[in-house]
Curated annotation (Swiss-Prot):
Keywords: Metal-binding, Zinc. It comes from Escherichia coli (strain K12). This is Putative zinc-binding protein YnfU. The gene is ynfU. It comes from the Bacteria. Zn(2+) binds at residues 19, 22, 41, 44. Coiled coil: none annotated.
Amino acid sequence: MSERKNSKSRRNYLVKCSCPNCTQESEHSFSRVQKGALLICPHCNKVFQTNLKAVA
């Protein structure tokens, strides 16, 4: 039986997203951003969701 490659580990890198509240950039996991999960800004501690059309 052959082992499967762990393809998820290759996609788990950081991308920069700007907060809509304070406009500061912060790094978040690519998989989290791609799923449309809620993100927390480390600068102003506000919760936001990225617009995938703007990132792509």
